[in-house]
């Protein structure tokens, strides 16, 4: 699917590598999507962690339920997994992290000084007040139906993301995320006149 997207939407050359059974799912995934088939151990560890933290997570989410429903029709495993991926793509499920990326691109384009907490806070407030980005009033990557103090998955991903940012020379961008995580909960509470605790969720990093 990724190669078809590169070819037909990005107008780039298509290449196909065979997976290696001795590699992990994360290692194979990184190997398959890169022309030179190379990846670092840290990249593989980061993707592996993300895959593990997203897998099932209690069994009651939309994509897991989809697998149960489709499997009950006595279909094959591949069809059940394809249905689950279709569910996961939805904006109110796994597709939420795409909205985080889009929001962050917007923030990076509109906040001149990524180290200025006041400037960052002012723009996050504009987003929360439906004056910026998609004008939905949602600060994507913030809030969870169950987790309020912290999302344990986010805590683990943040630590690994920091390692990866250091290795890739992207600490300025990581610090921007860190600042948003710090200021957004209070802004959301203030804008919505709510005392409900808000924390970053698994989609943020």
Regions found by a protein language model. Name each.
Residues 1-205:
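Non-transmembrane, aqueous-exposed alpha-helical and coiled segments at domain scale
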